[in-house]
């Protein structure tokens, strides 16, 4: 079976991560640029031939709108430049919270984004910790959905935390929390929240033994940090020894940083799917890189190898 040459490129939203992925893969990023017009319109351009190559484009969709449009245009440009295959590597998949109609007259944003990526000509998508696993079914091309548990679990084990329990911040996160609890051999706690409106949480309770436990809250993303900080404070008020969090995607919008620093959270463990704001107080944050995992998956996909063995499910 012929193996086509591989080239890795980055959109402007993920250059920090793409460079690490390329280095872990043993190569350098391909040469590209984005031309910007005076009215704000932009045009990506590849500055080297990609004819007959398998092209991997690394771009998280945060902030969502410009980065998604840039990714779509890079896919289209690669297709028109006669790339053999085009793979979109989207560590953080924006719009994933819009996976269904949760009230009348609203779009299903995740499905629309999937349609746009396929219309642009993508052959395959790689991502990590989708907000809802069923989003994979929105695509008619292969989707490699990686799990950050393969990165978080070794770090958590290295801390040697006694009396550890895993907590879900809400009912929707129970499946993820149960997976971590099984892998670590710990009890599980489920927090229940009543949300008054988007990004505003009402009251919160917990199901499970809290008193005397060191608790790790696991979730796929942290946005305004209202839910997780309320959960941490509630768990401490019920007698927890300590509360940490392991969150894949640090969106951290609005007052998130300040809330975390003012909360009972002892440590917030995140990945580098989205960069932290260097101008903020980051003393509670620990960042684990996903670069090696994505580089490994890129190598396996390119060489037609299975990938399920390299991350925990």
Question: Residues of each region from the PLM?
Answer:
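PRPP-associated nucleotide enzymes
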Residues: 1-313
């Amino acid at each position: 079976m012929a193996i086509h040459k591989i080239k890795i490129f980055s959109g402007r939203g993920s250059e920090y991560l793409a460079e690490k992925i390329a280095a872990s893969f043993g190569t350098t990023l391909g040469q590209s640029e984005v031309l910007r017009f005076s009215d704000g319109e932009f045009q990506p351009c590849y500055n080297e031939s990609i004819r007959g190559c398998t092209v991997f484009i690394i771009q998280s969709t945060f902030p969502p709108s410009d980065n998604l449009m840039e990714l779509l245009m890079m896919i289209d440009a690669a297709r028109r430049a006669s790339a053999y295959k085009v793979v979109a590597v989207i560590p953080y998949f924006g719009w994933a919270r819009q996976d269904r109609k949760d009230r009348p007259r609203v779009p299903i944003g995740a499905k629309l984004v999937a349609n746009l990526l396929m219309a642009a000509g993508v052959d395959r998508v790689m991502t990590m910790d989708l907000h809802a696993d069923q989003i994979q079914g929105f695509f008619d091309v292969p989707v490699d959905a990686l799990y950050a548990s393969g990165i978080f679990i070794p770090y958590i084990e290295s801390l040697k935390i006694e009396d550890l329990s895993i907590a879900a911040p809400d009912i929707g996160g129970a499946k993820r929390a149960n997976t971590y609890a099984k892998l670590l051999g710990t009890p599980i706690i489920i927090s229940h929240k009543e949300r008054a409106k988007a990004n505003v949480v009402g009251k919160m309770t917990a199901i499970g033994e809290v008193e005397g436990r060191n608790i790790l809250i696991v979730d796929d993303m942290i946005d305004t940090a209202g839910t997780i900080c309320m959960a941490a404070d509630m768990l401490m008020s019920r007698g927890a020894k300590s509360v940490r969090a392991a969150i894949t995607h640090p969106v951290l919008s609005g007052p998130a940083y300040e809330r975390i620093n003012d909360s009972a959270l002892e440590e917030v463990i995140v990945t580098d799917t989205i960069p932290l704001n260097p101008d903020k107080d980051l003393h509670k944050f620990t960042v684990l890189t996903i670069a090696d995992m994505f580089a490994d998956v890129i190598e396996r996909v390119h060489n037609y190898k299975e990938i399920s063995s390299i991350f925990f499910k």
